Amino acid sequence: MKLLKRTAFSLLGILLLILTIATILEKIYGTDFVNEYIYSSLPFVILWGVTAITSLLYIIKSKLHRQPVIFLLHLSLLFILAGAFTTWIYGEQGTMRVRQGEQQTSFTDSKGISHQLPFSITLNQFEIIYYKGTLAPMDFISHISVADKDCHRQIQGKVSMNHIFSYQHYRFYQSGYSEDNEGSVFSVSHDPYGIGITYAGYTLLLLSTVFFFFSPQSRFRQLLKSPLLHRSLTVILLLFAFSLNSNFLKANSPSPKVLPREVAEHFGDLYILYNNRICPLQTFARDFTIKLYGSSSYKGLTPEEVLTGWLFYYDSWKNEPIIRIKSNEARKLLEIEGNYARLKDYISTINEYKLEKMMNHIRSGEQVTDKRGIEEADEKFNIINLVCTGAMMKIFPCRNIAGKTLEWYSQSDQLPQDMDNDKWVFIRKSMSYVNEMIVMKKYNDACLLLEKIKKYQQKECDGLLPADNKFKAEKIYNQFDYSKSVAMACICIGLICFIYYCHCMASQKRTSRKAIIILNILLWIVFTYLSAAICLRGYVSNHLPLSNGFETMQFMAWCTLLLTFLLQRKFAMLLPFGFLLCGLTLMVSMLGESNPQITQLMPVLQSPLLSIHVVVIMIAYSLLAFIMLNGVTAVILHQSQKECKEQIERLQIISQIILYPAIFLLAIGIFIGAVWANVSWGRYWGWDPKEVWALITMLVYALALHPRSLPWFHRTMFFHVFCITAFITVLITYFGVNFLLGGMHSYANG
């Protein structure tokens, strides 16, 4: 019995170590290397098989079948492994390329081996569906015919993103298309048995999880009945400090020339094609200001004032230290002190571009110190030039002669030769007229000209522009630029709460009811702010805002507050957790990019399964973060000189209670993601670094759910230290993969 137990858990430990090493090797040697020598290798498969068999024998010896729900839960995992093994043996995956009008009867696997199909595929037509009024693709659709000689029949089918065509257990997925739009690339998967077994495992896992939480015999229900929970609970946070370098402008520094605010706002009210999306010009102005300065406001000026300042008062603005330079190497090349450069700092006294020599080295592939920082500084210089010449201001829509397609142009673009003369003159001259009115300070006339441009936009687009409500909603959302301030406020409030609750715990006093009411009011204010920001962003983008790192961290902060509201009645001292964790996640969301642009969603990301997958996993991460902070609190209390044994035990029970839904949500989230991946591109598991680290996280935390087999987890302090250490896997899963290891899930890779 002991030998089986030690063998099973030792093998699991070896698997975790191999998976960890594999993700590092993938970064060094590439995906093909680890797929061939680790993930698809026979020894790796045998190791999983031996681990599964040993675990099954241990489960039987432990007489776990006497607890049907727990037994089914473990059995579901074995089903999933059995499905993966079946896929490894019988499954076939490959790629098929077919031209329009051509017939194809085979596909090629990753090793270049051709596999014959028992039928033929003919591509009748390939089409790209675009988002309204833009050239951003919304979906790729292939219309196909299948000819089956054995059955003497021919059927019609359609393959598109998130829409599979299946025939005789062969599944076809739209994975690409030819450059001339005359051909399609299909991912082909033939897995007649593995998918069914795996999905049976997923279903069994979901059902057994639900039954577990409702079973009176489950350990989760027993923990809820613990007498320690019916006394005053104390849950406290440890705050780790964020060092924020703030740069303040001197109050007496002169402001550059700008338009009157109401005139600048008229500019912000125009439509623009930006980032393959029709949006308010205000959005472009905001992103432009953030790109240059790192904030949407400069010296109290609005983004519209900053943008129009560069457009109409270039000589004044080129002397402004508005360009944020993060790279020390770039600062040396520009010969500046401090973090901000002026545009004229880029040009030497002999009228040479200071970064030109270094950029030539970069373009030629030479090794350069801080290549990324220099490229970023160069990019900002080029963006200003493109804005000041009007090249980025695509504010003039124009239909072609047939009226079928809509193109957007800037004043400086090459216009079609067959364009109507009146349109040509309007596009070429209207902004010049606006400039003349501004030079003569005839601001009312300038506003009238801007209104004419907007009427031209509305007439030319005719039904393709965003709805008025959506347009206004985006302008309102652009005002929600206070995440950093909210984050700092939450951290400060959380710190005060932390000190206050520590004092109450040490002196055995009850927390003030007034303090709790005030904290709840503040929590509601932050929750309302976040809810409004997330809803507006989702409404404007036409999809759940969970498509990048910024959005998922904002959603995690929202989940944290929601969980605080739901749990604080049972665990009243969770209140500091809510503030601190919300503040930290909001601060993290601001680290990579102040606020990424709203973009059209890639076709493959339009599945509702993806949104559910991200939501469930973000909630799980929030719960695991609570547990980690709970553990930190326990360690602080343990190190104090006062007797806090009972409080530490309470913290352990709270963490154990939260741990069950956290792990089950993480497991369900992983497998929902697997179903989405199978629907989207034909494989439910691809050993992507984020998939691997999510699996590692789930398995590591699952160890803490086995105190009978691993008696160390009965020790209170061991449990808390384990939960703190285990949170490293969550950090690697999210940040390590996104910014270091890379992979298909990496937000940093776009």
Residue ranges and their predicted role:
Residues 1-750:
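Solvent-exposed, non-transmembrane regions of integral membrane proteins
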